[in-house]
Amino acid sequence: MATPTAVIVLAAGAGTRMKSSLPKVVHPVVGRSMIGHALHAAAGTHPDHLVAVVRHQRELVAAEILRNNPDVIIADQDDIPGTGRAVQCALDELLRRGHSLSGTILVTYGDVPMLDADTLNALVRSHDERGATVSVLTTIVDDPTGYGRIIRDETSGDVCRIVEQKDASEAERQIREINAGIYAFDGEFLRDALMHVGTNNNQGEVYLTDVLAQAYQADRVTNGVVLEDQWMAQGCNDRIQLAELAAEMNRRICVEHMRSGVSIVDPSSTWIECDVRIDADTTIYPNTVLRGRTEIATGCEIGPGTTLTNAQVGPGCRVPAAWVSNTRLEGDTIVAPFTSIER
């Protein structure tokens, strides 16, 4: 499978529904910012170039992006709104730096923290196998309200167009297959098509979805890849969705640790961030929080009611009801309950 020429991560939005002084994509989910998760997934496709498009609170967002990955190219979106315009700004920045747009270009979002590299690589693989000009991830939901609907060709099954909620007819609003918002494009077609995309829609924006419609009208292959795991494309618009995403990601982290030989007595009350490492045959008791780059060796008993932050715990340690931060515990250490250790 060929690797992408570029992955473009869109992170220019204000995220006003978060009701926060912080940009939406900077909010943490299980120990990593949303944009950090997006960049981690994008890097897993091994692209030639990784680009992030910014606008709202530009300096803060750009700093968080570069903290996660200093090799990311920062592109600035101008006053023209819309996802299509954001991608156009990214392409312009690549061209300004002398990079080719030939090959596959992936487009994803900075507020979809559960999307992983495996899913992006599967999209690229399907795009290549079908010889597609545009491929889009889709998913089928019970309630499609608010999402762009996927309109398919009844003969070929290709995606004809994507209709946004505000532009959809009553019949189109009954369709349950929705746009997950993650794309693979032929890079040169994408560049040319965006030059012809206008703002003739109810939002007055440059829609990226119009590129797909152009490809279909030009008799190109427009590929729809159905995503079975809806969480992979779940965006975050407010604090409620933030909590839901964090809970699901934490559940999956706990499951992975248990499959690797860690005993977690009550996963529902145990919170483990994404960079924590735990060896087999350690037991985690309820109401325990493991944060940062905490590492726990084999044979330990952690909790109940313990918080570890960037702690290194040697084999055979017992740490009940304690707060330990930035500290190394040697093997077989027993920490007294209600102890706080911070260095």
Q: Can you annotate each of these PLM segments?
A:
Residues M1, Q203-R343:
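Left-handed beta-helix
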Residues T5-V29, T45, N68:
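Glycine-rich N-terminal loop/short-helix segment of MobA-like nucleotidyltransferase
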Residues M1-A6, S33-G110, M114-R125, E129:
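Conserved N-terminal catalytic core of the sugar/cofactor nucleotidyltransferase
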Residues V9, I35, L50, A90, ...:
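Residue-level signal for inorganic ion chemistry
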Residues P28, M114, A184, G235-C236:
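Short aromatic/basic micro-patch
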Residues A11, V54, Y109, T138-T139:
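Short beta-strand/turn micro-motifs composed of small residues
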Residues L115-N202:
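Conserved core of the sugar-phosphate nucleotidyltransferase
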Residues L22-P28, D79, V197-N200:
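Short glycine-enriched, charge-decorated loop/helix-capping segments at active-site entrances
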